[in-house]
Each structure stands twice: as structure tokens, then as C-alpha cells.
């Protein structure tokens, strides 16, 4: 239990608080609508569907308030950089913003389903009462408001000949129209957010997600018509529903039971969402302002394995290791922004990203930069680029640990390029305040060509550490996870050479996948009383494996070895 609490304790606490608030709101509003005196006649008309519609509505307000906050990147980056208010543990929760965003989205979907189904029953009860297809009590309640100076309870006011006509009345009211629109928006947003769509058809995901604007507008005005009604406080003073409920035929005839008066609840949703919507509007204004700032592409480098490197400059741009930016290329798409990890170091006078060509947008950028041509491209022909960021990630905390494990899979090595470059610069500048004492670096890749663009950096580090008699500072293991028989024979022939046949490094390339259990146990034995940061940029399956290893290999004792798992999320 202690091992688990080291990595997941605070995250689970946050989730439990969030779930607890959802349960509290649901129960509180369910009991309010199911037991309070002012809703006695509304319950007579609608039954338990009233409370089952209003309780999830309260939870929807709460979760729609939360859904925008995890995607306010500038706000999160500001909080992350405020070390005075954010410890490492708190920052790790900020790094899980997208996970929380998805959880809130699924909670919204759940409560939307309950709310919609309950209101479909409510519409049926209201319509049946107006076509005289209900009990006499409901019909009598629905007739209130037909006479002058009376306020109505049933929102269906006209007499209806058949239930289908009543359904038409319901969906043509403001609440019905907005309900249909925001539900359709929610369905489209969620279905286009699956992993398959995001990876293979990112443009579909990107454009569909912007339906959130319509969703929030519809949500804000959804309750403006006030169709869910209750007995007014003034009416309750002269008409006690507990005493008069059984004497409906005497209403208006005896002094103690005058005709009850009803009013709709004032809309509340806008009060929940106006704050987050204002913050998100500020977020978008900041992004727009940044997108207008001039960015100059100083160099484009084509690497093997269909990877390009863009080196850029922008006035006032400041970065930290492991951060990422959003990039827009109007020549490819005027609206799309794509996230990329910075591969340059803060000490360099430019910032760079490495982009693997895997989709329509990256293919378009590849061609716009002239990388599909053999001749050099003139600088003035390079496309205009807009940059938003940089934004903080888990990798920023690398220098907060004495010992770290860096694990990159394929192109996922990019954030560690920035870290290792920064380490190299710090050693070149004789940095004395470097807390980091040991790096264990693991790189898993399927293809030998993918190693080429990164090998030069590792060679520089390897040489630098040897010259400073600190060769043990960096321990790196490169794994080739895909090879054929001819490659295996070639590797075997050159195995005894001083340098590796693939990378040119003294450290030989390993074949297959790491035995993570052995790796963690070995590192734990070498650093028995240390908090070790484990940083991953790679697939979910690997993240799950490493997270389990961090939990199982962390000591339950506060003074023992603790592996702290961190994963890149953007």
C-alpha cells in the first residue's frame, strides 16, 4: 500500500474528491426535488422522473465548469512554473490534465444520458395529461393556467389530439431545441476523440472538437424558458400542498386552499460556467496574440526515417527542458495547431522541433519546407509558421531529482534530446549547482535509421563525460526492437569492434526489449535511499508497465528508494 501511495496516492485522492462532489450534488438535488414541499405538485405530475432529471443536471453544471480548465494550457503552465505554490507532487497532477479532461467528459456523457432519458419520461407525462390520457389528478393540475390570472404547472399549454403532436411541441421549445443540439454536439465530440480517430484522422478530431462553442452556448440558454416549475414561496404561505393535495376539487372554493401559483426555476447553468468560459476566452486571446508574433525558420534539416528538424527563432521566446509548443502552418491549414516537443536546449540561441511525417498535415509541412526536393530551399521560400507556447510538461522536473530514468520509444525520444543537450551545456559551462547526479537513459526503436539523428548528441555527451572523468554520469541503453535475419548476421560479425555498428557509440546496441523488472531492481540496489524520477515519452502499454514497476519496486519505508513515475501528455 505504501508503494502504491508514493505514485498514485495524491491522484486517487483528487479523483475521490471529484467523485465525492458528484455524489454529493446528485444526492442533494435528488432529495431536494423528491422531498421538498414546493415540488409536491410537480412530483404529482411527473413522478420520480423529476428528481432523476434535476439531480444529473446539477452534476452536469459542475462537470461542465471543470471540463475547460484542464485545457487552459497557459494557466496550467503558469501554475506549473509557480514553484511557490506548486510542489513536485502538485505539478505531477497538473501533468495529468488531459486524463482528467477525459474523465470529466465521460462523467458529462453519463449524466447527459440520465438527464435526457428522465426528461423524455417527463415530456410523456406532460403530454399525456393534455390529451386526457392520464389520471384525473394530473389532468386537473395541467388545467391550471388555462383561466385568466392563473399560473401554469404543465409546460404543454395547448390541448393536443394525439401524443405525437405533444412531442412536436416539446422539441420545438427552447429547452428541446438546445437539448437536441448540445446532445448531438456531445456525441460528435466524444466519438471523434477515440484514439483511432485522433491518430489517423487528426483533422476530424480537431475540427469536431470546436463544436464545444455551440455546446456551451446551448448549455447556457438551455434553462432560460424555465419549463420545470414549482409552487411559489408566496403561494406556499396561503396554500399548504400537504393539506390541500387531496381536495383538488375544492381549490379556489375554500379559504385555506386557493388556486396554487407556480413559477419556473431561474437558469443556473450560466453561473457555473461563466468563470471557466472567461478563463478559456483569455486563453484563446493569449494564443491568438502569440500566433501573430513573427517566427523565423533559420534551418530545416532532413533526417532519416522521414523525420525533419525545424530550427526557429522568435523574439522573447524562453523555454525550459522538456517543454512543448503548438505549431500552425497557414500554408498547410489556417486553423490547425499541432503539438511538438522542443528538442533544443534552453542554452541555445534557437528552438527546434523534430517532426515525423505520419499524416496529411505533417506531409503538407514536409512539402511546404521543400524537403521533397533534392536542391536546397531558399530561406524566403520557407513557409510562415505560428508558434504558441512553450508549455510545461513532466520532463521539466528532471533536474529536481538526483537520479532519473529516461525512457523514450521511437520519436518519443525528443523531450530527452532537450534534457541531454542541456546537461551537456551545463557541463561545458562548469555548472556547480546541478542536483542531477546520474542518468539512466533507455531508447527503444524499431528501425536502425531512427538512431542516426540522435547518435551525434550521445557521442558528444559520451566524450564530454570521459574528458571530465565522470563517465558514470550517463548510462544509456539503446534497444533495437525490430530486425531481420540478415541484419542479425551483420551485427554478429561486427560485435567485437570497439564502437557499435549502428550508432558509432562505445555502448553497444541491445536487441529486443528491456527486462524492466531486472532494470528496476538493479537501479534500486544502487540507490537504496533515493527518490528516482522515471520519465517516459512513449505508448500507453509501456506506460502501464513502467508505472507498475515504479509501484512494485518502491519501498514502503519513507527513507527507502522511491520510483516516481512521470509521463508526457499533450
Curated annotation (Swiss-Prot):
Q: Which Pfam families does this UniProt record tie to the protein?
A: FAD_binding_8, Ferric_reduct, NAD_binding_6
What gene, per UniProt, encodes this protein?
A: CYBB
The listed locations are:
Cell membrane
The catalytic activity of this protein is classed by the Enzyme Commission as 1.6.3.-
Q: Which GO terms describe its molecular function?
A: FAD binding; metal ion binding; NADPH binding; superoxide-generating NAD(P)H oxidase activity; superoxide-generating NADPH oxidase activity
- Reaction it catalyzes: NADPH + 2 O2 = 2 superoxide + NADP(+) + H(+)
Positions that bind FAD: 199-200, 337-339, 341, 354, 356, 361-362
Q: Where would you say this protein principally sits, based on its record?
A: membrane
Its quaternary organisation is: Component of the phagocyte NADPH oxidase core complex/cytochrome b558 complex, composed of CYBB (heavy chain (beta)) and CYBA (light chain (alpha)). Component of the phagocyte NADPH oxidase complex composed of an obligatory core heterodimer formed by the membrane proteins CYBA and CYBB and the cytosolic regulatory subunits NCF1/p47-phox, NCF2/p67-phox, NCF4/p40-phox and the small GTPase RAC1 or RAC2. Interacts with NCF1 (phosphorylated form). Interacts with NCF2; the interaction is enhanced in the presence of GBP7. Interacts with RAC2. Interacts with RAC1.
Organism classification: Eukaryota, Metazoa, Chordata, Craniata, Vertebrata
Q: Which residues lie on this side of the membrane: Extracellular?
A: 37-46, 131-163, 223-267
Which residues constitute the cross-link Glycyl lysine isopeptide (Lys-Gly) (interchain with G-Cter in ubiquitin)? Answer: 161, 255, 294, 299, 306, 328, 334, 381, 506, 567
> Does the record's keyword annotation contain DNA damage?
no
Q: How is it modified after translation?
A: Glycosylated.
List ligand-binding residues for NADPH: 411, 446, 481, 513
Q: Where does heme b 1 bind?
A: 101, 206, 209, 280, 287
Q: Which UniProt keywords apply?
A: Cell membrane, Electron transport, FAD, Flavoprotein, Glycoprotein, Heme, Ion channel, Ion transport, Iron, Isopeptide bond, Membrane, Metal-binding, NADP, Oxidoreductase, Phosphoprotein, Transmembrane, Transmembrane helix, Transport, Ubl conjugation, Voltage-gated channel
Tell me the membrane topology, using the record's own terms. Answer: Multi-pass membrane protein
The protein here is known as NADPH oxidase 2
Concerning CDD domains, the annotation shows: NOX_Duox_like_FAD_NADP (cd06186)
Residue numbers binding heme b 2: 115, 222, 226-227, 268
Tell me the organism. Sus scrofa (Pig)
Give ranges for the Cytoplasmic compartment. 2-9, 73-95, 195-203, 286-570
> Transmembrane residues, as ranges?
10-36, 47-72, 96-130, 164-194, 204-222, 268-285
Amino acid at each position: 500500500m505504501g508503494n502504491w501511495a508514493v505514485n498514485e496516492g495524491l491522484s486517487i485522492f483528487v479523483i475521490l474528491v471529484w467523485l465525492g462532489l458528484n455524489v454529493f450534488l446528485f444526492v442533494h438535488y435528488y432529495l431536494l426535488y423528491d422531498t421538498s414541499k414546493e415540488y409536491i405538485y410537480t412530483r404529482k405530475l411527473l413522478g420520480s422522473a423529476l428528481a432523476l432529471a434535476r439531480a444529473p443536471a446539477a452534476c452536469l453544471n459542475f462537470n461542465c465548469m471543470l471540463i475547460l480548465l484542464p485545457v487552459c494550457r497557459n494557466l496550467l503552465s503558469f501554475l506549473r512554473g509557480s514553484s511557490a505554490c506548486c510542489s513536485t507532487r502538485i505539478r505531477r497532477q497538473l501533468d495529468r490534465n488531459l486524463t482528467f479532461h477525459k474523465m470529466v467528459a465521460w462523467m458529462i456523457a453519463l449524466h447527459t444520458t440520465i438527464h435526457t432519458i428522465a426528461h423524455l419520461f417527463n415530456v410523456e407525462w406532460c403530454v399525456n395529461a393534455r390529451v386526457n390520457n392520464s389520471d384525473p389528478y394530473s389532468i386537473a393540475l395541467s388545467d391550471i393556467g388555462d383561466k385568466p390570472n392563473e399560473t401554469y404547472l404543465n409546460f404543454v399549454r395547448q390541448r393536443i389530439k394525439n401524443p405525437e403532436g405533444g412531442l412536436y411541441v416539446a422539441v420545438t421549445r427552447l429547452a428541446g431545441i438546445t437539448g437536441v443540439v448540445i446532445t448531438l454536439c456531445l456525441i460528435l465530440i466524444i466519438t471523434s476523440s477515440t484514439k483511432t480517430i485522433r491518430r489517423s484522422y487528426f483533422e476530424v478530431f480537431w475540427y469536431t472538437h470546436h463544436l464545444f462553442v455551440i455546446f456551451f452556448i446551448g448549455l447556457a440558454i438551455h434553462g432560460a424558458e424555465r419549463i420545470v416549475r414549482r409552487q411559489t414561496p408566496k403561494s406556499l404561505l396561503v396554500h399548504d400542498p400537504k393539506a390541500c393535495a387531496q381536495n383538488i376539487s375544492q381549490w379556489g372554493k375554500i379559504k385555506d386552499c386557493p388556486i396554487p401559483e407556480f413559477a419556473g426555476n431561474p437558469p443556473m447553468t450560466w453561473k457555473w460556467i461563466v468563470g471557466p468560459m472567461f478563463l478559456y476566452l483569455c486563453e484563446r486571446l493569449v494564443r491568438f496574440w502569440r500566433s501573430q508574433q513573427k517566427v523565423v525558420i533559420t534551418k530545416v534539416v532532413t533526417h532519416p526515417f522521414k523525420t525533419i528538424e525545424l530550427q526557429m527563432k522568435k523574439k522573447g521566446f524562453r523555454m525550459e527542458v522538456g517543454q512543448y509548443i503548438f505549431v500552425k502552418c497557414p500554408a498547410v491549414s489556417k486553423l490547425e495547431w499541432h503539438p511538438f516537443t522542443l528538442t533544443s536546449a534552453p542554452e541555445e540561441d534557437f528552438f527546434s522541433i523534430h517532426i515525423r511525417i505520419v499524416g496529411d498535415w505533417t506531409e503538407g509541412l514536409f512539402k511546404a519546407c521543400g524537403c521533397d526536393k533534392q536542391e536546397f530551399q531558399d530561406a524566403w521560400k520557407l513557409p510562415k509558421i505560428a508558434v504558441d507556447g512553450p508549455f510545461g510538461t513532466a520532463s521539466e522536473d528532471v533536474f529536481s531529482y538526483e537520479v532519473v530514468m529516461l525512457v523514450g520509444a521511437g520519436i518519443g525520444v525528443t523531450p530527452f534530446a532537450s534534457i541531454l543537450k542541456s546537461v551537456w551545456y551545463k557541463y561545458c559551462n562548469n555548472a556547480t549547482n546541478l542536483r542531477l547526479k546520474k542518468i539512466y537513459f533507455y531508447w527503444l526503436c524499431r528501425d536502425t535509421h531512427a538512431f542516426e539523428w540522435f547518435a551525434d548528441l550521445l557521442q558528444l555527451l559520451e566524450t564530454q563525460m570521459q574528458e571530465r572523468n565522470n563517465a558514470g554520469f550517463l548510462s544509456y541503453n539503446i534497444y533495437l526492437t525490430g530486425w531481420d535475419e540478415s541484419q542479425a548476421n551483420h551485427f554478429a560479425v561486427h560485435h567485437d569492434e570497439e564502437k557499435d555498428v549502428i550508432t558509432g557509440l562505445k555502448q553497444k546496441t541491445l536487441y529486443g526489449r528491456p527486462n524492466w523488472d531486472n532494470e528496476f531492481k538493479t537501479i534500486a540496489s544502487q540507490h537504496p535511499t533515493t527518490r528516482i524520477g522515471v520519465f517516459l515519452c512513449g505508448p500507453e502499454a509501456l506506460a502501464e508497465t513502467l508505472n507498475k514497476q515504479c509501484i512494485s519496486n518502491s519501498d514502503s519505508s519513507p527513507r527507502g528508494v522511491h520510483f516516481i513515475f512521470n509521463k508526457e501528455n499533450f
